[in-house]
């Protein structure tokens, strides 16, 4: 498959350079209206009543139509994603920072369990991890690493036997700066390759990964979650779960990436502008969103 050339736009940025004001309550792209107090509006136009989920060392969060309102901590997101059971954190700790996006709250419901996974390099899977990989039924692996990285720590044979392997390199590894996160976002060939997989029904379940499962995987996860309608706070909390695996994180850099997505008109507008077909976006949403049951 031929993809558009790689355009690494190093957008001039200081920590405050994106500058856009942000609504942290249900401001994703699912089309679900949100009241001024953050409550999701129901069909008759009135605001729904929030239901407390409890707080983790802070004031209580609430869930409305599947959404969490501030503050949202990684621990609260762990609780919200427990609906996916043992599949939330995967590979028995053999592959650090590997987890399902299933159960992540959306204004219209939640991310469907068992459809999209994110992780770090798979070289240490071993027999137990290969068993877990098989049990998850993963059909597609999107590798965001460069060819040199993949050659240094190749994925085990069991992954190639079970799943299609798609190389979608984002060539700026190991760098937590805002400018490099944004450059990852603008690696159009990589984003196009990833969404070519995510846009096919037969691709699911899908696993995408980089080396640490943090930076490049974090950018792609943020783009997917914003496209599905997750609020910025939920996206940030999902990203910060990386710290639970012992890896550092760069919240300012992901915030800058989210600002850049908004500057470009939102996740859907950005993806359409670089050539991702509308049908692929529709497939991703259909495969990955479990609506609230009335």
Residue ranges and their predicted role:
Residues 15-79, 294:
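Ser/Thr-rich, Pro/Gly/Ala-heavy low-complexity intrinsically disordered linkers and tails
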Residues 19-24, 68-207, 219-294:
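Cys-dependent protein tyrosine phosphatase-like superfamily
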Residues 212, 216-217:
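Ser/Thr-glycine-rich phosphate-binding loops at phosphate-binding pockets of nucleotides
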